[in-house]
UniProtKB/Swiss-Prot annotation:
This is Elongation factor Ts. Belongs to the EF-Ts family. It comes from Campylobacter jejuni subsp. jejuni serotype O:6 (strain 81116 / NCTC 11828). Gene3D superfamilies: 1.10.286.20, DNA helicase RuvA subunit, C-terminal domain, Elongation factor Ts, dimerisation domain. SUPFAM superfamilies: Elongation factor Ts (EF-Ts), dimerisation domain (SSF54713), UBA-like (SSF46934).
Amino acid sequence: MAEITAAMVKELRESTGAGMMDCKNALSETNGDFDKAVQLLREKGLGKAAKKADRLAAEGLVSVKVSDDFTSATVSEINSETDFVAKNDQFIALTKDTTAHIQSNSLQSVEELHSSIINGVKFEEYLKSQIATIGENLVVRRFATLKAGANGVVNGYIHTNGRVGVVIAAACDSAEVASKSRDLLRQICMHIAAMRPSYLSYEDLDMTFVENEYKALVAELEKENEERRRLKDPNKPEHKIPQFASRKQLSDAILKEAEEKIKEELKAQGKPEKIWDNIIPGKMNSFIADNSQLDSKLTLMGQFYVMDDKKTVEQVIAEKEKEFGGKIKIVEFICFEVGEGLEKKTEDFAAEVAAQL
C-alpha cells in the first residue's frame, strides 16, 4: 500500500473541503490515488462540488482593457509579493500599462511580452526597473485577449478590488445587435465575477464527468435528507432526488418520454386537451430545471442571473435577443482571479496534519 503523507492529506483536504480523517481514509482506500480519492469522497457526500482549483496564495492585481470599439478585450494578472505593494499606485499603473501594451501589440505569450519593446526598451528590462523601484519581485503570470469576429462584440469587467477580472466575447447577426449588446456583456461579466462558472454551457461538459457528479449529487442530497428526517422540521421538506444532473443527459427520447408522462397526468386530472399547450411548457421547464442542477452550479448559461435570480443567464439573453431584434451567442469568457491555482507556504499546516495522523 502506498504511504499516505501529510502533504497528500493536506492537498486532498484543500481540494475537496472534506475532513482531515475522511481524506486520510479515502487515500488509504484508494491506495494513494488522488483522483480516485476525490471521487470516493464525492460519492460519500463528503466533498464539495468539483470546481477549478481555488487555493489562492500570491498577491497582485488583475487588469482588464477593452478597446474603444469593443472588438478586443484583454485580461492580465501580475503578481507581487505582498498585498501592500498590490495597492501601490505605481504597481497599479504598471498593470494597466502592461495590459494596454499587450493588447495594442497583439501579444500571445509571456515570452513574447518579455521580448517586446515598451517605452523604447525591452519589456524584460522595463519590468526589472519597476522591480527595483517598487522593491518587490513582480511577475507577469498570464494574460489573454478575446477578439470580436464579424458582427461580434467583446466587453470586460474588473472587480473593484482588482482581484478578479473577466472578459467575454459574443457573436451577433448584425452590427446593430452587437452594439446594443455591449452593456449586457458587461453585466454578464459581473455575473461571472460573482458566480465563477467553470464552463460556458452543458454542451461543454464531459459525459463521464456528469455521470460521476450525478452520483455525488445524489449522495449529497440523500445525506441532507437523512438530517432533515432526523430534525422533522415541517419548513424543510426532503429534497426530491433527480433522475439526472445535466441537460447533457437529457436526450430527445428522454424529453419526449417526460412530455408524454405529463400528458398522461393531465388526462388523469381531467384537464381538457385544449389547454394542455398552455401547461406543458411550464411543466417541461420544471422537469429540465430539476434534472440539470449541475448546470446551474457550473455553467454560465445554466446559472441563475445575479441581477434577476428568477431567470437563468440563457433566459436573460433570449429576452435581449427579442428586444434587440437579433441573435446573441456567447462564444467565450475568461475569468482570472489573483493567485488562482498558486499555493501558499503551509509547512505549519502540514505539520499539524502530520501530528494528527
